[in-house]
Amino acid sequence: MPQPCLLMECESSPREEEIPPLFWGLDPVFLAFAKLYIKDILEMKESQQVPGTYFYNGHPIRRVDIMGAVISVKERETFYSYGVDDATGVINCVCWKKLSNAESSSDPAILSTARELSMTSQLKKLQETIEQKTRIGIGDIIRVRGSVRMFREEREICANIYYKVDDPVWNMQIARMLELPKLYQKVYDQPFRNPALQEEEALNNKDNLDLAGLTSLLSEKIKEFLQEKKMQSFYQQELETVESLQSLASRPVTHSTGSDQVELKDSGTSGVAQRVFKNALQLLQEKGLVFQRDSGSDKLYYVTTKDKDLQQKIYHIIKEDCQKPNHMEKGCHLLHILNCVHLNLRWDLSKAVLQRVLELLEDQSDIVSTADHYYAAF
């Protein structure tokens, strides 16, 4: 079975601080049964804050999903103990025995008729047959989903669900072997970091940001600047004269081409800064925070929440159309309103900007949402 990339986990774990439990729910892996290799389950670092929770590449993990061959079986009064091997390691799985309905209802005092006795007997025989055919022995393939725990200083899985895998031609095992490397690449080997520290890390690592990272950081700083100065409109050139923003946009950036890192030289700093400003403003436009009535980087930008003229025009469009028979009952759909804005105002307005204006008008009780993406004004 293919091996996961364990080097990243081994190198990153010692230097990374444990993420506070408050943020664990932000990682989808925390609530899922993580499909991990047994070797990784055995090597995961246990949380110091919440025993019973483990970390792989920063991902908090409580429950796992494994599939492998049974190499040992121990039967106890209330549970089975299976040693499961997936070709990367062996782990013990505690699987509780299923309660038999026949045993719980076979009390002669409860069974009053011969017919009930006969049905109970037949049911018991059926259950015995099923148990015989599904009995798990050495060499069988088993799938186990459960929580990871420590018992006598050894890590094991306490099963919530377990069953014998009927896979004579290896279809399920091959599918699993193909699935796990993709999960590792897309999910488990992508480190989960403390959201509270991400912005701080970005600020501390400005010199190592690529163009996309620097653009995202600059867009946040522009947003803060516009809010602080309470600006209603601006030109890109105005922002370029702000020393703090210009200093950030002029930082050296790296571009990844495969494994090569090519740093832009100082001779191109001015052009790169303009490009970063343009991309940052484009990002704010995509979020609906700013807009242009006419497209072009040299055109005036408007702050969406500060543009009273835009709010009034959209309000009047909704109010007028709601008086028409086809919109009187349900109101106007968001896309219909956007189309009216493009036709009547000839403004290059995006859906994201319109959504922010509609939310603002609704907060002010100027319009109401009558259904999903439908709005009415009175």
Curated annotation (Swiss-Prot):
<keyword id="KW-0238">DNA-binding</keyword>
<dbReference type="InterPro" id="IPR018856">
    <property type="entry name" value="Stn1_N"/>
</dbReference>
<dbReference type="GO" id="GO:1990879">
    <property type="term" value="C:CST complex"/>
</dbReference>
<feature type="region of interest" description="Interaction with CTC1">
    <location>
        <begin position="8"/>
        <end position="195"/>
    </location>
</feature>
<dbReference type="InterPro" id="IPR036388">
    <property type="entry name" value="WH-like_DNA-bd_sf"/>
</dbReference>
<dbReference type="GO" id="GO:0032211">
    <property type="term" value="P:negative regulation of telomere maintenance via telomerase"/>
</dbReference>
<comment type="subunit">
    <text>Component of the CST complex, composed of TEN1/C17orf106, CTC1/C17orf68 and STN1; in the complex interacts directly with TEN1 and CTC1. Interacts with ACD/TPP1. Interacts with POT1 and POLA1.</text>
</comment>
<keyword id="KW-0779">Telomere</keyword>
<dbReference type="GO" id="GO:0016233">
    <property type="term" value="P:telomere capping"/>
</dbReference>
<dbReference type="GO" id="GO:0043047">
    <property type="term" value="F:single-stranded telomeric DNA binding"/>
</dbReference>
<feature type="region of interest" description="Winged helix-turn-helix (wHTH) 1">
    <location>
        <begin position="201"/>
        <end position="305"/>
    </location>
</feature>
<dbReference type="Pfam" id="PF09170">
    <property type="entry name" value="STN1_2"/>
</dbReference>
<keyword id="KW-0539">Nucleus</keyword>
<dbReference type="Pfam" id="PF10451">
    <property type="entry name" value="Stn1"/>
</dbReference>
<dbReference type="GO" id="GO:0010833">
    <property type="term" value="P:telomere maintenance via telomere lengthening"/>
</dbReference>
<dbReference type="InterPro" id="IPR012340">
    <property type="entry name" value="NA-bd_OB-fold"/>
</dbReference>
<dbReference type="InterPro" id="IPR040260">
    <property type="entry name" value="RFA2-like"/>
</dbReference>
<feature type="DNA-binding region" description="OB">
    <location>
        <begin position="64"/>
        <end position="165"/>
    </location>
</feature>
<dbReference type="GO" id="GO:0005634">
    <property type="term" value="C:nucleus"/>
</dbReference>
<dbReference type="GO" id="GO:0045740">
    <property type="term" value="P:positive regulation of DNA replication"/>
</dbReference>
<comment type="similarity">
    <text>Belongs to the STN1 family.</text>
</comment>
<dbReference type="GO" id="GO:0001650">
    <property type="term" value="C:fibrillar center"/>
</dbReference>
<dbReference type="GO" id="GO:0003697">
    <property type="term" value="F:single-stranded DNA binding"/>
</dbReference>
<keyword id="KW-0158">Chromosome</keyword>
<dbReference type="InterPro" id="IPR015253">
    <property type="entry name" value="CST_STN1_C"/>
</dbReference>
<dbReference type="GO" id="GO:0000781">
    <property type="term" value="C:chromosome, telomeric region"/>
</dbReference>
<dbReference type="InterPro" id="IPR036390">
    <property type="entry name" value="WH_DNA-bd_sf"/>
</dbReference>
<dbReference type="InterPro" id="IPR014647">
    <property type="entry name" value="Stn1"/>
</dbReference>
<protein>
    <recommendedName>
        <fullName>CST complex subunit STN1</fullName>
    </recommendedName>
</protein>
<dbReference type="GO" id="GO:0042162">
    <property type="term" value="F:telomeric DNA binding"/>
</dbReference>
<dbReference type="GO" id="GO:0045111">
    <property type="term" value="C:intermediate filament cytoskeleton"/>
</dbReference>
<dbReference type="InterPro" id="IPR042082">
    <property type="entry name" value="CST_Stn1_wHTH1_sf"/>
</dbReference>
<dbReference type="GO" id="GO:0005654">
    <property type="term" value="C:nucleoplasm"/>
</dbReference>
<feature type="region of interest" description="Winged helix-turn-helix (wHTH) 2">
    <location>
        <begin position="306"/>
        <end position="378"/>
    </location>
</feature>
<comment type="function">
    <text>Component of the CST complex proposed to act as a specialized replication factor promoting DNA replication under conditions of replication stress or natural replication barriers such as the telomere duplex. The CST complex binds single-stranded DNA with high affinity in a sequence-independent manner, while isolated subunits bind DNA with low affinity by themselves. Initially the CST complex has been proposed to protect telomeres from DNA degradation. However, the CST complex has been shown to be involved in several aspects of telomere replication.</text>
</comment>
